[in-house]
Amino acid sequence: MVDSYDDAFDGEKSKTQIKRELHALVELGERLTTVKADTLARLPLTDELRKALAEACKHTAHGARKRHMSFVGKLMRDQDLDAIHAVLEQIDSSSRQYNERFHNLERWRDRLIDGNDEDLERFVNEYPDTDRQQLRSLIRHAQHEKARNKPPAAARKVFKYIRDLDELQRGLR
């Protein structure tokens, strides 16, 4: 005998699976409320969802916010989730690259201030547009500040100079 009960539910999702998917949509909606307006404009969203995301910031009471985010989750069902995830992943990737580059420049600054001429030569080889005289002067001021336990204003100038060189070399300026 064929069990018709099992055959009836083969293609359907369980109640738990549906709840998980709805919860994931609400979490994605929460994430979209934290995205900047220019990034939000790049996402393929309906006008109704854009309006609901803008209103989400106005709800501060826990219950009201939770209700509104459930509404946002409901609106998210009709969206192209793959396209939204792709844009958000691209943003996360560029953010990680920016942070990695930023930390690399901080390491260069610290090596130049704490280091010797070899570090300066390596830096000049990596960034050929460097004005050695200006960079040496900035490093010398930063070393004096560090020796006298003063606030690191000159170290910030070294970092700014290094960052400007990096942006120039990458064509960002």
UniProtKB/Swiss-Prot annotation:
The keyword Flavoprotein does not apply. SUPFAM superfamilies: PSPTO4464-like. Member of a network of 50S ribosomal subunit biogenesis factors which assembles along the 30S-50S interface, preventing incorrect 23S rRNA structures from forming. Promotes peptidyl transferase center (PTC) maturation. This is Dual-action ribosomal maturation protein DarP. It comes from the Bacteria. Gene3D superfamilies: PSPTO4464-like domains. GO terms for molecular function: ribosome binding; rRNA binding. Keywords: Cytoplasm, Ribosome biogenesis, RNA-binding, rRNA-binding. GO terms for biological process: assembly of large subunit precursor of preribosome. HAMAP family: DarP. It is found in: Cytoplasm. The gene is darP. Pfam families: DarP. The keyword Cytoplasm applies. Belongs to the DarP family. GO terms for cellular component: cytosol. Its main location: cytoplasm.
